[in-house]
Amino acid sequence: MRKDQPASRSRALKKTGIPADGELGVEQARAPYGVAAFAGDASDIIRNMRSGTPADIVPGLAARLGVTQDGLFRLLRLPHSTMKARISKNDTLSSSEQDRLYRTEKVLARTLAVLEDHASAKAWLVRENRTLGGEAPLALLDTEAGYELVLDTLGRIEYGIVA
């Protein structure tokens, strides 16, 4: 850990293996959470996504979230048969599919950092939330606006503001 990183970032990294701001660094590429395609700095992530993220990341992400693949497809509004075919052939994901999975990975990391417990994080992500219009946080990650709303809600929780 660098000396110039805030203490909260250091505590979150120590507890969850993921930085508090949800950014996956190079050291997290081999961590139990996170996808190598989404690891590194922003330019690495962009390069990886432009060259195509393999569909075989989906089962691991679903497992980390504690949902089935079908449940993940439904929550993120991903086409079920297309995703199943991509996974079985280990094809690359489309840009919109990658974006949804990237947002999901970042929100999972942020949720783990804020709630500091994997079981609590998984439960929070799939439970309907009044603050989010009665939707589960994962169900909002199909859009950028929903992603921002979920991150804002996590920020409120982190700072003790009623969310």
Describe each PLM feature range.
Residues 1-163:
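Non-transmembrane "mature" sequence context
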